[in-house]
């Protein structure tokens, strides 16, 4: 098994010792990898019409017309691919992307310039030497690898993803890059440790939550869970520079107990949160403001906070 991963630069993955929480490493995730992920990176390089479509969509402007044309071409590209993956560089990293059935991968493949552009700009502006970043709901690693490509060898990045198939894609993508700063952990974060039911949307494999999804076709699996504080302490974090949370409405279950129980020295300076205000059980924006955070940006999908007091 180790030899098969060696072709994909496994040094970029920090292997984890087995733990009761169900945290496991890239090599342990290999059982979840589909046959196409057993082939060397580059086996699915885009060519012909698909390559041209990707070039066109990535060059599209941010205007209304530019986006409209890009999305139309993207549909053509998806139909042409017929479910096949694509090996490509995106956001400064090499990735194998499966655009059919995962909105995140579709966006990153065809239109990375539109992918959380403001959020990424704000995050990139705050990267410094020794940057520490926790990516909660890491999906296939877009944010984690974006930060790793810019933060240098002294960074510490945790990519948290509980969905087994998506975790396998995440670890594969990490392994294709030489950064050596990203550690993938397969567990859910919640308000207490244990085992939780994770709901999965078969139409969008990157959408999973410990809260019931709006999809009528949602499936469910049991996954290990821990709290953000327990995770940070077990990893030896003394400072967290930034956190991104995209867990389909369960962001409050993670942040509320963390801000209640964690020492202030561990509170992140910068937070990107998926805007799920219609699903949160508590007023998370009010809680963040009471803890000294100010909202510095609001986009179609996310809220961005920065701590103004320490």
Language-model regions: role of each:
Residues 8, 12-310:
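Phosphate/nucleotide-binding beta-alpha loop and adjacent structural elements of enzyme active sites
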């Amino acid at each position: 098994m180790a030899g098969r991963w060696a072709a994909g630069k496994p040094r970029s993955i920090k292997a984890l010792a087995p733990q009761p929480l169900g945290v496991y490493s890239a090599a342990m995730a290999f059982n979840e990898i589909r046959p196409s992920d057993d082939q060397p990176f580059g086996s699915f390089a885009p060519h012909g019409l698909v390559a041209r479509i990707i070039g066109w969509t990535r060059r599209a402007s941010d205007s209304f017309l530019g986006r409209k044309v890009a999305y139309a071409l993207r549909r053509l590209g998806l139909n042409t691919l017929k479910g096949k993956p694509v090996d490509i560089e995106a956001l400064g990293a090499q990735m194998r992307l499966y655009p059919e059935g995962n909105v995140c991968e579709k966006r990153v493949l065809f239109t990375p310039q539109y992918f959380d552009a403001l959020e990424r700009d704000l995050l990139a502006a705050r990267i410094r030497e020794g940057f520490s970043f926790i990516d909660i709901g890491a999906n296939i690693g877009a944010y984690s690898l974006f930060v790793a490509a810019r933060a240098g060898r002294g960074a510490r990045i945790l990519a948290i993803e509980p969905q087994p198939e998506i975790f396998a894609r995440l670890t594969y993508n990490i392994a294709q890059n030489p950064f050596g700063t990203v550690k993938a952990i397969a567990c859910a974060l919640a308000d207490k440790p244990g085992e939780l039911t994770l709901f999965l949307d078969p139409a969008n494999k990157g959408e999973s939550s410990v809260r019931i999804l709006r999809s009528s076709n949602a499936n469910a699996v049991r996954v290990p869970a821990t709290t953000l504080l327990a995770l940070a302490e077990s990893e030896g974090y003394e400072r967290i520079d930034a956190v991104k949370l995209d867990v389909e409405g369960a962001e409050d279950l993670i942040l509320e107990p963390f801000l209640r129980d964690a020492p202030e020295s561990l509170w992140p300076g910068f937070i990107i949160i998926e805007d799920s205000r219609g699903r949160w059980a508590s007023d998370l924006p009010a809680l963040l403001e009471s803890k000294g955070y100010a909202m510095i940006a609001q986009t179609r999908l996310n809220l961005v906070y920065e701590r103004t007091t320490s």
